[in-house]
Amino acid sequence: MERPGATTLKGNPLTLIGPELKAGDKAPDFNLVDNSLKNVTLADTGNNVRILSVVPSLDTPVCDAQTKRFNEEAAKLPGVDILSVSMDLPFAQKRWCGAFGVDNVKMLSDHRDGSFGSHYGTLIKELRIESRAIFVLDRSNTVRHAEYVKEVAEHPNYDAALSAARTAASAASA
C-alpha cells in the first residue's frame, strides 16, 4: 500500500509505504536489529507500555533532539519503555548513544529490509528511510496513540505522546 503525499521533506511531497495506523489498531509485529546485532520482534520488547519513536536518522538535528528528549523523559515514566527506530546502522546508533550519553532509550535499526517501516506505514519510498512518527503501544500491543509528522523536518507532538503513555501505564497498573 502506497500513500502518495502522506509526508513532506522541506515542502516536497513524498510517498509512505504501508498502512496508516490509528489508535485502537493492533500493533503489527516487526523484525529489527539492536546494537548487539540481535534480532528484536514486538514480543521481545516486553510487557510494559512502549513509545516507539521513529526517526529518519540520528545524524540530523530534529532526530537528535527527539531522541535526547525521550531519553530525558524516560526516567519520569515508570512502566514505560522507549524504543527509537531508524534506518541507521546499529554501529552508528551505538556510537551516537555513546557520544551523547543516551542510555534510557533502546535503539533499534530497520536497515535490513525496512519491514518495520512498511508494517507501520513510515517507510519513505523515494528515500528508503523512515518518516518521523510516534506510536504508543499498551501492554496488549494495541496502538493507543499514533502520530505521523506531516513535515519530516518538524518535531512531533511530544506532550500528546507522553500523555498517552502515562494514561496507558496508569490503566495497566490499575
Q: Residue ranges of each PLM-predicted region?
A:
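Chalcogenol-based redox active-site neighborhoods
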Residues: M1-A174
